[in-house]
Regions:
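N-terminal, Lys/Arg- and Ser/Thr-rich interaction peptides
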Residues: 1-22, 33
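A short linear-motif detector with a strong N-terminal bias
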Residues: 5-6, 55-59, 101-106
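Long, contiguous hydrophobic alpha-helical segments, chiefly transmembrane helices and signal peptides
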Residues: 8, 35-38, 116, 152
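Glycine/small-residue-rich interface belts in oligomeric ring/scaffold proteins
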Residues: 17-99
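Internal, well-folded beta-alpha domain core
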Residues: 65, 69-74, 80-188
Length: 188
């Protein structure tokens, strides 16, 4: 079997975690839906805002999932963190959002606090067993993209490096054999 392998990295990343609303936390690693969204952007598929805007104009019911998810949900991926023990340092960023509608406070200034991942890096593997996966491989190998890939939001540009097609083999275990699966952290 063949798989696409590449390293996904950036200076910073922000994958919003909605646990609290006084400060915006980030997930510690890229999650599947964020990765699918980034791959969908590379291929030019619609996301949440594009889907909602188009349907609101037509007074149509908003479907459960955006275009990128409908098209890419079945691809088989593995995300392997290159961080020490799978973790990346986080840094608190504070900035002002001074557009008038950002805050109902006097002056319309909203102070935003976000935790960003510093220098994140992952090895991404995509099994090339369907047309969508092969299309992703074509775009990434040939450095094509409809929309720029980001690591969570447009403040965090994504670097895609070390792109290659690799051979992988399926492992089957017997009753007396254990197979260790390390899909998030590299084996030491």
């Amino acid at each position: 079997m063949k798989a696409l392998k590449f390293t996904l990295s950036g200076n910073s990343a922000f994958f919003k975690d909605n646990v609290i609303n006084t400060v915006y936390l980030t997930y510690g690693n890229i999650h599947r839906v964020a990765l699918l969204g980034m791959l969908g952007a590379i291929l030019g598929y619609g996301g949440y805002s594009k889907q909602n805007d188009m349907l609101k104009k037509k007074n149509k019911k908003i479907p459960d999932y955006p275009e990128f998810y409908e098209k890419l949900k079945d691809i088989k991926i593995s995300i392997v963190s290159n961080g020490k023990n799978g973790y990346f340092n986080k840094k608190l960023q504070t900035f002002n959002n001074s557009v008038g509608y950002a805050s109902k406070e006097e002056g319309g200034n909203l102070i935003v606090k976000q935790f960003w991942l510093e220098n994140p890096s992952w090895d991404i593997y995509i099994l090339l067993d369907c047309d969508e996966a092969k299309k992703i491989a074509d775009y990434i190998q040939n450095r094509k993209a409809i929309y720029l890939p980001y690591l969570g939001s447009n403040d965090h540009l994504a670097n895609i490096m070390d792109v290659e097609i690799i051979d992988i083999e399926e492992k089957m275990s017997s009753e007396d054999e254990t197979i260790e699966i390390l899909s998030m952290i590299k084996a030491s």
